[in-house]
């Protein structure tokens, strides 16, 4: 499960507080002790602080590109210089570890949007691996999420008159048309197309797949616990999908709108102060609104997975494309922090990741990596290795030139 803090979370105000830094750097939040001795987080994260034994924080993420779309493409591919047709890590996992035919292998909750969005080819196409390993997208529009009353996933929202028998009749008609149109030797591309068509029909007819998307089947107290906002309900949906057999779920961490806010974009974490909301304010684009909700929802997810016996077999990742500048600046209309890729933080949990751990270290202002830098390649290799995939697996179009990752896992699986 990969949670994208789209826009770039401030490391100083969350995972890597610096209480001894000058006032114009450290911000207003005090450090908060976690359940792990010697490990502190920002004070807006009390719920994650209480379950620190379930995750590891990397404080030494680093690259050199302060541009949203490019940095997002790097994060998606696990590469500092991805090709235009590089598959995302999600598509690689889908190719090597597909789900059962009656479940989608890869689901994406909440579409990237706004000026920070990576090219759709970087996450929706499957790259050179092809569209068969691209994700099933839920959340084309910002309101298309389980927190919206009456939510129903578009891929499963077929017309009432399209009964199971009519759908099966269409499948048979398609098969007959295909078989009658070719009297020659089977074409590999045509065979693959038929396989994909059959998989699509299986998904449409799968009660298990459709029911996994019904978040309203959850008890009200569970929905309340996750949070009645887009991010909380998407995390709950992600848990249901993983539990049902989906191999990978990506979630864009859009936290929804604060009271009286108008919709601007889903770039919650891009907190320059340019949207009329300061980074420390309580609007949709401020930490005062976004971080407590992310904290409560993520802590609930980790506890819920653990209680269900799923955490040991489920990798949970939370990261953005970069961090924020140590120095607080003035944006167009309020104060904020700007893009900072040189040193930032990410979280990993489950699937054998050591809990209660901090990997790497930053300097006294969280501006530069002091110890054990983690590149996009290393981060990607760590995800693959934790999923049981050898990063050296050859996946390039010719079958041997390019490995799945050029990085080194920071943990041994």
Language model regions located:
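Ligand-binding pockets and gating/stacking loops
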Residues: 2-413
